[in-house]
């Protein structure tokens, strides 16, 4: 199950109590204080990792707690420190304070790690309080409580390529072709109910780092006002390096391709105007359903209405035009 938002209560460990104890040896009838300090409570850390793409493993949890520190002991022994708890999250995770909405950290790289809740300090045993004037202190202090924090985790996928389009534009079929995977495909709206990630290898570049591609669930008119799957998934578009708009040029499923493209771009810019500066390519999909003359006519109309856009013709079903798309990825993403 894809989970890209979650709220958790994080509880760091309590420090162990210091103890009052006395040195008791056969030839030291008046032995002094011998109580040790408590161990520190475990802290909670969050670390970004690759190969993790949602918060699914945390979805049934309400809170997470680190270990408490152990109490001190006689013979001036310090209690064991509580074990830290490290939460793994995907790259692209935003960590916020749930109470204030304050952004605590934006995890963008593998291995980034921060302390979110500090463990409590261990209490002091009576050895700590021994002085020249108080050689037999009876005082010890309890451990400090660990920090407690309610946090929100929000994921914005980091991908090289983001596939964007209306439901049934053929995104999932194209995704399967490019990533050589099997995303569910069907002739009804919202076949893709959550973002899917795949690796795109071009023939002849198997020893190079593949591109990460995200199939974003179908966007509908009004998505920027949270219609359909709306804002839940529009945020995943923000961090992709290249947006690949997938438009059904056949016009069979919906209204005209030019109207689809106009609405789609309008929704993205209504969500966040800064997206206009992102690199975009328009993939005119399902050309296998058109005769050559029909293709030329519709492409000419689109280029007339969108003269500044870059178009590529292809068929995710038959593979026609896919090699040219690979070449385009290479030129765009190698810059």
Curated annotation (Swiss-Prot):
Cofactor (UniProt): Mg(2+)
GO biological process per UniProt: ribosome biogenesis
Function: An essential GTPase which binds GTP, GDP and possibly (p)ppGpp with moderate affinity, with high nucleotide exchange rates and a fairly low GTP hydrolysis rate. Plays a role in control of the cell cycle, stress response, ribosome biogenesis and in those bacteria that undergo differentiation, in morphogenesis control.
Family listed: Belongs to the TRAFAC class OBG-HflX-like GTPase superfamily. OBG GTPase family.
Domain OBG-type G: 159-334
GO molecular function: GTP binding; GTPase activity; magnesium ion binding
SUPFAM superfamilies: Obg GTP-binding protein N-terminal domain, P-loop containing nucleoside triphosphate hydrolases
CDD domains recorded: Obg
Documented EC number(s): 3.6.5.-
InterPro entries per the UniProt record, alphabetical: G_OBG, GTP-bd, GTP-bd_Obg/CgtA, GTP1_OBG_dom, GTP1_OBG_dom_sf, OBG_GTPase, P-loop_NTPase, Small_GTP-bd
Enzyme class: hydrolase
A Pfam short name: GTP1_OBG
Summary of subunit composition and partner proteins: Monomer.
GO cellular component: cytoplasm
Keywords, in A-Z order: Cytoplasm, GTP-binding, Hydrolase, Magnesium, Metal-binding, Nucleotide-binding
Chain ranges of the Obg domain: 1-158
Identification of the protein by name: GTPase Obg
Residues that hold Mg(2+) according to the record: 172, 192
Residues reported in the UniProt entry to bind GTP: 165-172, 190-194, 215-218, 285-288, 315-317
Location in or out of the cell: Cytoplasm
